[in-house]
Amino acid sequence: MTDKGKNDLTSKAKDKARGNPEKPPYWFEIIVSDPQKRTGDPGSSSGYVSYQISTKTNNTSFYDNRGDPESIIVVHRRYSDLLLLHDILLNRFPTCIIPPLPDKKVFQYIAGDRFSQRFTQKRCHSLQNFLRRVSLHPDLSQSKVFKTFLVSKDWESHRKVLQDSLQPNKDEVTDAFMNAFKTVHKQNEEFTEIREKSDKLDRTVTKIDKLFHKVVKKNDSMSEDYTKLGSNLQELQELVTGENEELAAKLKIFNEGVTQLSYGLQDLTKYLDYEYIVDLKDLEHYIDSMRQLIKLKDQKQIDYEELSDYLTRSIKEKNNLISGYGGSNFFANKLEELAGINQEASRREKINKLEGKITSLTGELENAKKVADGFEQECLKEIDHFESVKTAEIKKSLGSLADHHIEFYERILEAWEKVDDSL
C-alpha cells in the first residue's frame, strides 16, 4: 500500500475516533418553502399542505439524467411523506440518532388552524431543520431512501413500496416494554455524564423557550400599541392640516418614526416566533432523540446483565448439585424418594441438563456482550455527531438572533435620527 493510501486510512480512522465525528462526504443545501393547501382524495372533504423542497448538492448521483449538476432539484412533499422518511430511517438505522420531526399539532387540526400562514411557515422551518440534520449525517445522507425522497418525481409509487416494507420491530417493542422499569447495574460513567449534561441543556433550552414566548407576546402587544398610536397621530395630523401646516408636517414626520418602530418590532417578533423559538423546540426534540438511543443502548446492556445473572444462578445450582446440597428443596426431595425415584440418577440428569443450559447460555452471553459493547460504541459515535451538530446549530442560532436584533436597532436608530433632524 502506498504512503498516501496509508494516510487516507489513518485519516478515516481518526475521523471515526471519539471526539472527532465523521463528516458526510457531500454537502447539501436544502430549503423547504412555499406551503400550499391541496385538496385531498376525491370524495374527501379534508385537505393537506404541500411543501416545496429545493435541493442543491455536490453529489452528482442526485442529478442522474437531470441535466446540469449545478441546477436545483425541486420536488413537492407533504408532512406524511416526511413522517414516512423518518420512520424508514428509524427502522433501517437503529444505532443512529434520527433527527425528530415537528409534532403533529393535534390542536391546530381540531381548531382548523393547520392551513394558517403562521402554522405552515413555522412548520416549513422545522421540516427544513429535519432535512438539514439528515443531510449532515454521514450514513443517513447516503441512504437510498433519502435520495429517492429528494429527487423522485414518481414519489407516490415509491411511497407505497416503502410503506409495505415498514414493519414494526416487535422484538424491540417487547424488550422496551419488559425493560421499562429496569435499570443498568453497571452504567458507563461516560453515559452518566452525558445524561447529566443533556438534562441540564434540556432544562436550559426549555427555560429560554418559555422566556421568548413571553417576549413574543409582549412585543405583539407593544406593536399593537404603536399601531394605535400611529393611527391617533394620523387623525391628529388631519385635524391640524390647513390650520397649522408646520405642526402637521412635524406630526407626519414623528408618525413615520412610530410606524418604522412598529414595523421593525413586527419583523423582529416574526423572526423570533417563526424561526428562533422553532429552533429551540426542535433542539428539545433532538435532545430527546438522543435520550431514546441511550435507552435502546441500556436495553442491550440490561439483556446482557440478565443473561449473566441467569448463567451465574445456573452455575451455582450445578455446583450445589455436585457438592450434594441439591437444587431442590427438602420436601421435593422427599416426594421424589417416596415416589421411588432414584435420587442419584435424578441428580445426574439435572446436572447434565444444567451443563447443556450453561453451554448454551455461555454462547448467548458472549453474543449479548458483543452486541452491547458494539451498540455502546456506535452510541458514543452518534453522540459525538449530535454534539457537533448541536454546537453548530446553537452558534448559528445565537448569531442569527444577534444579527436580527442589531438590524432592528440600526433600523430604528436610522429612522429616529431622521425624525430628530427634521424636528
UniProtKB/Swiss-Prot annotation:
A 1,2-diacyl-sn-glycero-3-phospho-(1D-myo-inositol-3-phosphate) binds at R78, S80, K104, R123. Transmembrane segments: none annotated. GO terms for molecular function: phosphatidylinositol-3-phosphate binding. It is found in: Cytoplasm, Cytosol; Preautophagosomal structure membrane; Endosome membrane. GO terms for biological process: autophagy of mitochondrion; cytoplasm to vacuole targeting by the Cvt pathway; early endosome to Golgi transport; endocytic recycling; glycophagy; intracellular protein transport; macroautophagy; mitophagy. Residues 217-252, 346-381 form a coiled coil. CDD domains: BAR_Atg24p. SMART domains: PX (SM00312). Pfam families: PX (PF00787). One of its GO terms (cellular component) is perinuclear region of cytoplasm. InterPro entries: AH/BAR_dom_sf, PX_dom, PX_dom_sf. Keywords: Coiled coil, Cytoplasm, Endosome, Lipid-binding, Membrane, Protein transport, Transport. Residues 1-25 are annotated as: Disordered. Belongs to the sorting nexin family. The PX domain binds phosphatidylinositol 3-phosphate which is necessary for peripheral membrane localization to the perivacuolar punctate structures. This is Sorting nexin-4. It comes from Saccharomyces cerevisiae (strain ATCC 204508 / S288c). The lineage of its organism: Eukaryota, Fungi, Dikarya, Ascomycota, Saccharomycotina.
